Amino acid sequence: MDKYDGSRVFFREMCKNNRDDFPYRRGVIMSELHTPCCPVVCKLILPDPLTIDFISKIQQKPFLCIQFCSVLPCLEILEEFDRRSKNDKSLRRFVDYEGATTLLTFNELFNKYSRIEGNQFVFHVDSDKYLLNEHTSKKIIDLINPSISIIPTLSLKHSERKKWSARKRTKLNDLYQTYYETLSRYPNSTKLVKPIHPCIELKEMGDFEVIEFPGFGFGESLNERYEWIKEMGKNLTGKEVRIIQLKTGTPLEILHAVLMGFDVVISPYPESLSEQGFALSFELPSEFEGNYEPEYVLNLLNERCKFFDGVYKDQIKDIVDLKNSVHIDVVESLMDEKSVRKESRAYINHLLNCKEMNGNIILSSHNLYMYELLFQRIRDSIENDTLVNFVYNFIQLNVKRD
């Protein structure tokens, strides 16, 4: 692995793979956030029901992903607080992300995509209708002051490439240009994330320090995803922070994204599993047998991760259904021996079946911790130049056996 002392301030590479087709690397964002990494996706404006303090016990540097649609219902309150706090410095902050790196995303990670009316995006939150235009986007960024913010634009799913009409392509590009020009015109400490898409003209857009690959996670195979990502990234310098947002974001999707060179992988999977009563439980290899080529391992990932009923599902043992009655008497087994949570499977089963909110809170913290463990092992294997073998052995160690 090549070593770098790093001359860039925002993102510093620590080591990287030499192969152009698989540009995975270890790095640091803003001298604190170690990559590759996965932020905690907030369904609301706050990481409720978990607190920043608790997340800091899971992640060395709390990293939160906040959605535009979750901020919109609170916009009037945020504006009122901002107005009053200028005259009263003793007011308790309405939203406090102190100590955390924050990423503001346009994608609705738990719902269907928004509709468009003119140049405005239409969201429906709890049966209420909210509109987002470029000026509202600017207002939200000013009030929230996120570390990083993805520029809103129309989403065209790569799984529907054949259906992209010239009108849709033009609409996506025009929307992006409008929002980009508005958001980049004003001074702000927020680093703007620019999407890379076949329909977006990127001329005269300056130096890309952070980029996003939108439109993935909607039914394309992992092999198709690989080919399209390679096509979209062929003109990049390799110095940019790469972000991908996945609609499912399973462990095998995570490993695939890291092999493809992504530094930040946004996945709602830990939270989605928690809502359904599922706990992540997988083995992490400590020894890596063999010497495998990336192409072979990518094909293996493609075979083991399939799209069913609107979501991706890994064909490995990685989750446990704690609502299942088989866990009623399992009082000595934890959700996973590696977990930060020490409650038994029987206790969680009881909480879930009684519809106690604490059951989902415990599951949420457990699942987030399991993903943090996975990413830590990914970072270690990149430093040791064993990532490809780690991915292969992870699959083999967790394969379902009849």
Swiss-Prot record:
Source organism superkingdom: Eukaryota
Cited InterPro entries: Queuine_tRNA-ribosyltrfase (IPR050852), TGT-like_sf (IPR036511), tRNA_ribo_trans-like (IPR002616)
Entry keyword Chloroplast: no
GO annotation terms (biological process): tRNA-guanine transglycosylation
Example of a GO MF term: glycosyltransferase activity
Stored Pfam families: TGT
This protein's UniProt keywords: Glycosyltransferase, Transferase
Record keyword Transferase present: yes
Family, as annotated: Belongs to the queuine tRNA-ribosyltransferase family.
PANTHER family recorded: QUEUINE TRNA-RIBOSYLTRANSFERASE ACCESSORY SUBUNIT 2 (PTHR46064:SF1)
Name of this protein: Queuine tRNA-ribosyltransferase-like protein
